[in-house]
């Protein structure tokens, strides 16, 4: 059985599976709705400023390039290391898991193929764990 018959992660296949920029934008909008709504995310929501527009835009732009689409983040802001960009935050297991829960709920709300939903969440676990590892408080 081939686990990735849709070739996610190859060229722009993940970007297309996510619905390109419009689909990524919907995902990120829903992600922050989840962060504002679920009790498990209160702590990580407080890490963000009151105005979510700047971080929303950055996440949309980052995911565009990360998923194989246009590299909007680097065009607008330059290069990025996700772990180093989040190093100042205290991200332990609880915060990592809350972030992943928000993303899982947002992904589940998207019209993606089930195989892409599983793939995307598995891929997002990698940078989430790296952020925890370099955090000011990785416990």
List PLM regions with ranges.
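Core of compact, soluble alpha-helical bundle domains
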Residues: 1-139
């Amino acid at each position: 059985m081939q686990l990735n018959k849709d070739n996610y992660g190859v060229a722009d296949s993940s970007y297309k599976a996510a619905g390109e920029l419009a689909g990524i934008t919907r995902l990120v909008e829903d992600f922050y709705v989840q962060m504002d709504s679920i009790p498990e995310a209160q702590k990580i929501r407080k890490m963000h400023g009151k105005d979510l527009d700047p971080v929303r835009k950055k996440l949309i732009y980052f995911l565009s390039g990360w998923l194989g689409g246009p590299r909007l983040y680097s065009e607008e802001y330059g290069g990025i290391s996700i772990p180093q960009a989040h190093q100042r935050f205290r991200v332990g297991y609880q915060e990592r898991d809350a972030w992943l829960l928000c993303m899982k709920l947002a992904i589940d709300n998207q019209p993606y193929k089930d195989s892409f939903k599983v793939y995307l969440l598995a891929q997002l676990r990698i940078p989430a764990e790296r952020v925890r590892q370099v955090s000011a408080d990785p416990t």
